[in-house]
């Protein structure tokens, strides 16, 4: 690998894939030799967006060469990145998450903004560099914003995200509401997923105090369909906890129509889950989290406080 590679986090979501592609497009137009890559399989929601705007998914990688120059988008925490990230040379980070478990040997360009989506930052960066966004890139940037903001309904969604979404929808030539709902529904089709798929397709590991916590989130139209698999979910999650030396695993199923989530908590620290969300996990270790849709803003932040 000679070029600088651009990638997002493991278990990639739509923002991670689309922002990697879009930032590679911008950097290339600015004269840099870069290539987008990915650290996992493309989910149905993301594939829907890529197909809509005639864009191929980036190459899949598992490692980068030692010393390779890399740019991180949509993440910065090393446990969410490529396995040997400590041996890479990180040149840039473009992100919208908390900054944690991150260090470099050399100075770098680090841009983190409190917006709902990395794509919103990239849309600004096109403007700052006087580079026009073409129709297909506008489409995938829009798709990323729709995904991260649950069609502009998430509490992480800012006015900047809203403005960017409307602007990009016009460039892409799509109706924001109808396209957005179609895309989210495509992602919520979990009929062909195994239980292992469900708990890994959008899972992120977090350091909370001295605890290792993994939080997996899936979007669904009918949460009850997912939890018909309760016993198997518990079995597979317990195995994952043991294999990865985790303290706690949260499996969050978000109802994209009602904007609520149901959580299944397995491992140590279930009392902290109760305290964080002012709920009581039932005998099956589940609870309804009313109005909770954002892992970043409504789950990670409040749960981290309980582990301090």
From Swiss-Prot:
Subcellular location field: Cytoplasm
The record's listing under Pfam families reads: DHH, DHHA2
Record Gene3D superfamilies? DHHA2 domain, inorganic pyrophosphatase (n-terminal core)
Q: How is the cofactor bound?
A: Binds 2 manganese ions per subunit.
Which residues make up the binding site for Mn(2+) 2? Answer: 15, 74, 96, 148
The family database entries (PANTHER family) matched by this protein are listed as:
BNIP - RELATED, MANGANESE-DEPENDENT INORGANIC PYROPHOSPHATASE-RELATED
Which protein, by its recorded name, is this?
Probable manganese-dependent inorganic pyrophosphatase
Tell me which species this is from.
Answer: Oceanobacillus iheyensis (strain DSM 14371 / CIP 107618 / JCM 11309 / KCTC 3954 / HTE831)
Report which gene this protein is encoded by. Answer: ppaC
């Amino acid at each position: 690998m000679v070029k600088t590679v651009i990638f997002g986090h493991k278990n990639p979501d739509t923002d991670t894939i689309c922002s990697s592609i879009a930032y590679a497009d911008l950097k290339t137009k600015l004269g840099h030799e870069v290539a987008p890559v990915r650290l996992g399989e493309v989910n149905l929601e993301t594939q829907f967006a890529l197909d809509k705007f005639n864009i191929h998914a980036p190459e899949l990688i598992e490692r980068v060469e030692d010393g390779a120059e890399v740019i991180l988008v949509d993440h910065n925490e090393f446990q969410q990145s490529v396995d040997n990230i400590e041996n890479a040379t990180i040149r840039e980070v473009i992100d919208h998450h908390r900054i944690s478990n991150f260090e470099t040997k050399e100075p770098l360009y680090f841009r983190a903004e409190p917006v709902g989506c990395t794509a919103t930052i990239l849309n600004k960066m096109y403007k700052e560099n006087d580079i026009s966004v073409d129709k297909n890139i506008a489409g995938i940037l829009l798709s990323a914003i729709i995904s991260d903001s649950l069609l502009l309904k998430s509490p992480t969604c800012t006015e900047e995200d809203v403005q960017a979404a409307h602007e990009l929808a016009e460039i892409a030539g799509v109706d924001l509401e109808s396209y957005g709902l179609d895309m989210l529904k495509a992602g919520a089709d979990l009929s062909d997923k195994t239980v292992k798929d469900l708990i890994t397709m959008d899972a992120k590991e977090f350091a909370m105090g001295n605890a290792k916590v993994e939080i997996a989130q899936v979007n669904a139209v009918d949460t009850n369909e997912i939890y018909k698999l309760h016993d198997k979910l518990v079995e597979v999650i317990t195995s994952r906890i043991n294999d990865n030396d985790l303290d706690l695993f949260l499996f969050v199923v978000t109802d994209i129509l009602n904007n609520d989530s149901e959580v299944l908590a397995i491992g140590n620290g279930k009392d902290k889950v109760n305290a964080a969300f002012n709920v009581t996990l039932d005998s099956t270790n589940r609870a309804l989290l009313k109005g909770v849709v954002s892992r970043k803003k409504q789950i990670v932040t409040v749960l981290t406080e309980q582990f301090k």
